[in-house]
UniProtKB/Swiss-Prot annotation:
Family in the record: Belongs to the NrdI family.
Xref: InterPro entries: Flavoprotein-like_sf (IPR029039), RNR_Ib_NrdI_bac (IPR020852), RNR_NrdI (IPR004465)
PANTHER family: PROTEIN NRDI
Source organism of the structure: Rhizobium leguminosarum bv. trifolii (strain WSM2304)
HAMAP family: NrdI
Protein name: Protein NrdI
Recorded GO MF terms: FMN binding
Gene responsible for this protein: nrdI
């Protein structure tokens, strides 16, 4: 199965979700993302940060990571975390990355996700990577 690449802030919400998946994963560092390189296909798991207008939805570290052409060339899909209290901007980072990188927006979960979210993503990743190998 492919790799999960993720970013998590000090809250560790995204990290906790990814850890519960039990899948192979690599974390984008909070500092120095410019030197972080991935050389294989991956699905990106990203939290959403934004103001009320949706600005700043994608964390700066993730933007720097994806600005590297090699990293961007290996992304195959995106999963976003968010907070439904923010209404229309819930999971907005996934929409932005999906559109800019032209990859599918595979799933959205709230905060650290539920057990159902974890099961859905695990099962979805198995199906996704099986199709990617065809």
């Amino acid at each position: 199965m492919g790799l999960i690449v993720y970013y998590s802030s000090r809250s560790e919400n995204t990290h906790r979700f990814v850890a519960r998946l039990g899948l192979r994963a690599a974390r984008i560092p909070a500092g120095g993302a410019d030197a972080f390189h991935i050389r294989e296909p991956f699905v990106l798991v990203v939290p959403t940060y934004s103001d009320g207008d949706g600005k700043g939805a994608v964390p700066k570290q993730v933007i720097r990571f994806l600005n590297d052409a090699e990293n961007r060339g290996h992304i195959r899909g995106v999963i976003a975390a968010g907070n439904s209290n923010f209404g229309e901007t819930y999971g907005l980072a996934g929409d932005v990355i999906s559109q800019k990188c032209r990859v599918p927006y595979l799933y959205r979960f709230e905060l650290i996700g539920t057990e159902e979210d974890v099961a859905n993503v695990k099962h979805g990743m198995e199906r996704f990577w099986t199709r990617e190998q065809l």
